[in-house]
Amino acid sequence: MGIEIERRFLVDGRYDKPWRSGNYSEMCQHYLSGVSHIDGKVMWNEIQLIEEEEVLENLTTWRIRLSGDTVTLTAKGRRVGATATDYNWDMPMEIYNSLPLDGLPSVEKIRHYWTGEDGLLWEVDEYEGSISGLIIAEVELESEDQEVALPNWLGLELTHLKGWSNASLSMMIKDSELN
């Protein structure tokens, strides 16, 4: 189990985009409901995703991310402040390809990696599809009170606001498709 401490911000993309000068990866994230953990097996839709002997409790969000040829299963707990429980497992591509993912809440984005003047790595997500134009930046921290040099292209801080997680955005997209 890990602990994720991060701050998230809207990005003002009308001006220079220095984050585009570095490395990036394309990602598709699918959000799962009805995931169970029984006898050391994490199951969804009667398909075994992974094996995990550790007790998994108080997890609220399950996600499968495809980035290049890497598939990652992630489970997160409820966020308190800037902190949440965070589990990550590599998943075989064969399992990913066998999953019925069509119709699931999903987001597609290009993630840029940009190093700030304080040496911290920023992940800047430029969303695709129906929320194209939305840009959110996040930075992982060692503690909630860690000092951060905030780039001048940041806008509103989203860290403590509900409705701006990737899971929430995926549900918003899904809801809009149904209307």
Regions found by a protein language model. Name each.
Residues M1-N179:
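Phosphate-end processing signature that detects enzymes handling 5′-triphosphorylated RNA
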